[in-house]
């Protein structure tokens, strides 16, 4: 593919993070295969958040844990991903609190909470 572009001396890729939440989603009733693939023991809803700058995933996980009775499944400060599980109301409450804090306290752009 690169040959098709002609001679290229180098390719430069940059990540220029904004202050934003790009995904806030509740999987209300995941199929068993999702739990198995993710390595999640808890049966219930799963919450997923994606943020930039990536390090803010740590803050989101802390807010989620303080907002409701959820289990933190995954926090990746290198990609800005957070995943947690619990009963559906607790997962929704945690996501709502994350969105509210990041928008109103930190001035982030946010997305609507989605659910499947």
UniProtKB/Swiss-Prot annotation:
Keyword match Cell wall biogenesis/degradation: no
Metabolic or biological pathway, per its Swiss-Prot or TrEMBL entry: Amine and polyamine metabolism; choline degradation
Protein origin, superkingdom: Bacteria
Coiled-coil positions: none
Any one GO CC term of the record: bacterial microcompartment
Location in or out of the cell: Bacterial microcompartment
Keywords: Bacterial microcompartment, Transport
One Pfam family linked to the record: BMC
Notes on the domains: One side of the hexamer is concave and lined by hydrophobic residues, the other side has a slightly protruding, 6-stranded beta-barrel.
Function: A minor shell protein of the choline degradation-specific bacterial microcompartment (BMC). Proteins such as this one with circularly permuted BMC domains may play a key role in conferring heterogeneity and flexibility in this BMC.
Similarity section: Belongs to the EutS/PduU family.
Oligomer status and interactors: Has been crystallized in 5 structures (all are mutated, 3 have an N-terminal His-tag), most are homohexameric with a central pore. In two the homohexamer lies flat with a beta-barrel on the flat face created by the protruding N termini of the six chains. In 2 others the hexamer is not flat but has a six-fold screw axis; the screw pitch is 33.8 or 41.9 Angstroms depending on the structure. Interacts with the BMC major shell protein.
Protein name (Swiss-Prot/TrEMBL): Bacterial microcompartment shell protein CutR
Species in which this protein is naturally found: Streptococcus intermedius (strain ATCC 27335 / DSM 20573 / CCUG 32759 / CIP 103248 / JCM 12996 / LMG 17840 / NCTC 11324 / SK54 / 1877)
Origin organism lineage: Bacteria, Bacillati, Bacillota, Bacilli, Lactobacillales
Gene assigned in the entry: cutR
